[in-house]
Each structure stands twice: as C-alpha cells, then as structure tokens.
Amino acid sequence: MLQLAAHNALRSPIVSALLGLGIALVSAGGVAVTHRCDADRRAALLVGGSAHAAGMLAVWVGVRLCFWRHPAPLPGSLPVVLPVVGVAFLLFSVQWIAAAVLSLSYGLQSAVVWLVGVTWYTVYAATFVGNEGGALFALFSWVLVIGPATLTLLAVLAGGERVVRRRLSADRETDERTR
C-alpha cells in the first residue's frame, strides 16, 4: 500500500526545525570563515560550496536511508539518479557560492539571511519522507522548481538591498551638501 501523506522522519517538527537551524547556521558560518580566509578566495568559495552541497545531499540521503517506514530504494537506474543528484549538487553549490560572493564582495547582508532561510527550509523539508513520489521525487522537485525559485528570490533580495543602500547613500550625501 502506498503512503499518500509524508511524515516527519524525526517524529517532531521542533527537532526537524532545530536540526535545520543548526545546519543553516553552520552554513552561514562558513561564509564568515571564507571572509576571513587568507587563502585563494576562489578555492575557498569552491570548497565552501561543495561542502554545503555535500551536506545537503547527506541530509537527504541519510534521512531516506535511516527513517523510511516502508523501504523504498533509490531507483536502480543510474541514468536517472546521477543527473538529478548531480544537478542538485550543482544547485546547492551555486546557492552557497552566490550568497557568499554577494556577502563578501558587495557586503549584502540579505544574502546571508537568505542562505540561512533556504538551508533551514531544505533540511526541514528533507525530514519529511514516505510520500507516494518515492525517494527521488523530493530532490527532483527541488532541482526543477524550488532551487531555481530560491535563486530568483536571492537575485530580487540582493537587487533590492543594493537599491535601498544606494538610495540611503544618496540621501546622506544630499543632507551633507545642504548643511
């Protein structure tokens, strides 16, 4: 019998939320560490993005392997699984790297706040298992819909913060000239 409704693998939404928050704060902390890094900035960004992506995929795989009520193995077809996992890895990496670059190069705080929110949501959503779609469905939907939507949201937030900062800066300059 198919399970039509997903259930929380950790049995408590609070535990899932705290797990998501912890991982999100570690991810945001990685941006701060990269900011203080004296090594090659590009290499640090690639390592940080890869670590973030590996962590997100580890949560997804770990929850499915440890907490799936009715074993639903990953699809045996590597031509289906590998592209989805590969694109998910790329999306998770790009999310972290984009937030880090916007924060480090332009000083945009909205990028780090966005990273915390998106990471929290990703981990929280990954703790829900057992729906009819199977183990790969959640990751597939992330690749096709949620991931690109979150990157679009980041672009809007970053653009909005830049506009507000420029406007405030122009207002300050005008006030100083009128004195």
Segments from the language model and where they lie:
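Acidic, polar-rich N-terminal leader regions of halophilic archaeal proteins
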Residues: M1-R179
